[in-house]
A protein has these predicted regions:
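Ser/Thr- (and often Asn-) enriched beta-sheet segments in non-cytosolic proteins
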Residues: 162-166, 183, 194, 204-206
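Residue-level detector of conserved, well-ordered beta-strand and adjacent loop positions
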Residues: 142, 185, 216-218
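Compositionally biased amphipathic helical and low-complexity segments enriched in hydrophobic
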Residues: 124-125, 189, 206
C-alpha cells in the first residue's frame, strides 16, 4: 500500500513551526497531532530540526527574516537544536519533558508490533458529537497485531476531558476481538484499568489537555 511508504510529518522547512508566534505559539499543541502521525499507520514519520524540543523558529535567519520557519541550510543554527544535541544541560525543564514524549512515541514505532505491522481501525465514524465525545477535539482509532491491541486517543482540546469511546461490532469482527474483560495499560503513563469489552459498547477515558492515551491490551481467544 502506498500509505506505508508515505512520510508523515507535522513540520518541515517550508511551514511555520508549531510553537512559532505565527501559528500555535505552544509546542505542546503539536503533541496530539504527533501521536496520530506516529501511530495511525505503518508509515515512516519525520521529526523536524528541534521539533522535539519545541523550536519556535522565531530567529531572523538570513534572507527569510523572522517568519516562524527554520531553514534547512547550514548558515544558521537553531538554538534548541544546538542545546538538544550539544548542551542538553541548557535545555529548560519543559524542553526536556517534551523531548522525552517524542522519544517515547518514536520508540513505540519500533517496539510495538501493532504499530510496526498491525491493522488500523478508524473509530471516528461511530463516535459522533455528544456530551461524551467531541470529534472536533478528539481523535480515536485501534491498532492490532496478533493478540496485541492498542486503543489510541489524541486530545486536541486545551482542557482535560472525560470521554466515552464507542467500539462498534464491525471492529470486533474486522480485527477478530472477542468480547471479554481486559486489563489496559496506558503506554504513556503506565496507568492501568480493567475494561469489559462489549460489541457497540463504550470505554470511559480520562485524557489530559494536548495529550493522549495509548492503551495496550492483550486478547484471549
Amino acid at each position: 500500500y502506498i500509505c506505508d511508504h508515505m512520510l508523515y510529518f507535522l513540520e518541515n522547512h517550508d511551514e511555520q513551526r508549531i510553537a512559532s508566534d505565527f501559528f500555535a505559539g505552544n509546542p505542546w499543541k503539536g503533541v496530539p497531532g504527533m501521536i496520530v502521525s506516529v501511530l495511525l499507520q505503518q508509515n515512516p514519520v519525520m521529526v523536524y530540526a528541534g521539533q522535539e524540543f519545541g523550536e519556535k523558529g522565531m530567529d531572523k535567519e538570513g534572507f527569510s527574516g523572522q517568519d516562524g520557519r527554520s531553514t534547512i541550510f547550514d548558515y544558521w543554527t537553531s538554538d534548541t537544536v544546538y542545546k538538544g544535541f550539544f548542551n542538553r544541560d541548557a535545555l529548560t525543564t519543559d524542553e526536556k519533558k517534551l523531548s522525552l514524549i517524542y522519544q517515547g512515541l518514536l520508540r513505540f514505532c519500533n517496539r510495538e508490533k501493532a504499530v510496526r505491522e498491525g491493522l488500523t481501525f478508524d473509530l471516528m465514524y461511530v463516535n459522533h458529537q455528544s456530551h461524551q465525545f467531541n470529534p472536533h477535539k478528539q481523535f480515536v482509532f485501534l491498532r492490532k497485531a496478533d493478540d496485541e491491541v492498542l486503543l489510541v486517543v489524541a486530545n486536541f482540546d486545551q482542557e482535560r476531558v472525560q470521554i466515552n469511546v464507542t467500539i462498534p461490532t464491525h471492529a470486533f469482527d474486522f480485527l477478530g476481538i472477542p468480547e471479554q474483560e481486559v486489563e489496559m495499560t496506558d503506554l504513556l503513563s503506565g496507568f492501568t484499568k480493567v475494561v469489559d469489552l462489549k460489541r457497540d459498547g463504550q470505554v470511559a477515558l480520562d485524557v489530559e489537555a494536548n495529550y493522549g492515551r495509548i492503551y495496550k491490551f492483550n486478547i484471549k481467544k
